Amino acid sequence: MKIIIIGAGIAGCTIYLELRKHLPKPPSGEAHKFTVYEAYDTNIDTTSDDRGNGPTYSSTLIVGGGLGVAANGLNVIKRLDENMLREIVRGGYSCATMNMKSKNGKVLARMQPAGKPALDGKGQETMNTVACSRHGLWRELRKRVPNDVIVTRRVSEVVARSDGLNVVSFVDGSPSAEADLVIGADGLKGLAKKALFPGEKADPFPPHYEGLCGVGGFVPYSLVKGHVEIGSMNFVMGGNGFFGYFIAESALDAPHRDSPYHVSPPGESVGWWSTYSVDECPDPKSVDKEDILKQLRERHKNWKDPVICKVLETSKVTSMYPTWIMPPLPTWERDGVVLVGDAAHALPPTSGQGSSQALEDVECFSLFLSHHLGKAYESGGHDPTDYKGVIRAAAKQYMDLRQPHVKRILDHAQQSQNRKRDKTAIEEYIMYAFMWMIGWFPNVMTKPLKQLVEYDIASEVYKLLHVKS
């Protein structure tokens, strides 16, 4: 099978690794052929700042800052490569506790979806969320993709053909490439999506700016030592925005710094981010970051949380990310062109599930495709040059399983992110009162999150395949 992957970000690199691991070998013995197209340099040591500000296929290649990978996403990585999981955790920090706070630093509610952190060094039964840099997560994935598989070339068009190989064309006029399967891992504003709706001149499902923008950066842990609970991720809400912070790395000598089941002593930095309402979407390429920092200080000048006060005194804005989402697509596949990750469903940061859902997508589709391809090979009657039916069957089950699950996460995230919008003083304190009351019932508050992070996409796939068989 000839496979083209558009985008070498988190989803693109992971689906290459998943397909390479799971796809059965053809009866002919000839290996499947993979090519990954990415518009930007993907050298593992190249940072987002080095790549410039042009359009790209992979949001992870241009957006800096941090992210949280929840247990459901970490388990995808664990099943793929346990050594890679340890490297990713080593480069980040295991967070067992989620603190919801008022702007003055008062804890209103606490969630511990993996249970109370163990104090005896034995670790927990369930993985914690791992906070890490986007680049750090991507770097570990990229290290495992051979350099000769990735071609630095910008795609101009993808055409899904019902009666032959799908066609990928390029901006530089290079000869078009053909493939049985084209994976669109090209992000929120990707081109692969257009192949699913060929009769439309304009994008029928354009991304939507949500009226919220985030900025973020890092400060030395020494500045806030004693004010950040070990093993915590903190969410601070007020009437004119939102602020979050987390320990960004473990101490270098921590014995369990590569374990998501343990909480380690902190390292040298703390990550922070702030989300605020703004009607018109700012352009991260041209915005004046000094002006943004000035606005940040003005917005939070009356907030008394000690960590926020230190951040405002010393920090610089290093990343900026407007909140975009995409309306639910009626399909993620057409004639062998399949979308994964943000290309299929862009989730707001409030979900805490952007990277984890992309990881679930790629494992899910890879397992379904491997199953149907294996059955086709075993039957002996399969035309080795015609994979349309196999891809269609796998994609249908992939969408049937994933679309309702992702839609539920999106609906909940959109409700939650309303807490980040500007409020009157009365609305602000009603929010505090509600959260304080919910905080008295931690099991009730934690249950939905616990169900989400304990979701096992591989088991769900195998259950569905067992029922069908």
Predicted regions and their residues:
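Conserved N-terminal helical subregion
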Residues: 2, 18-20, 57-64, 68-218, ...
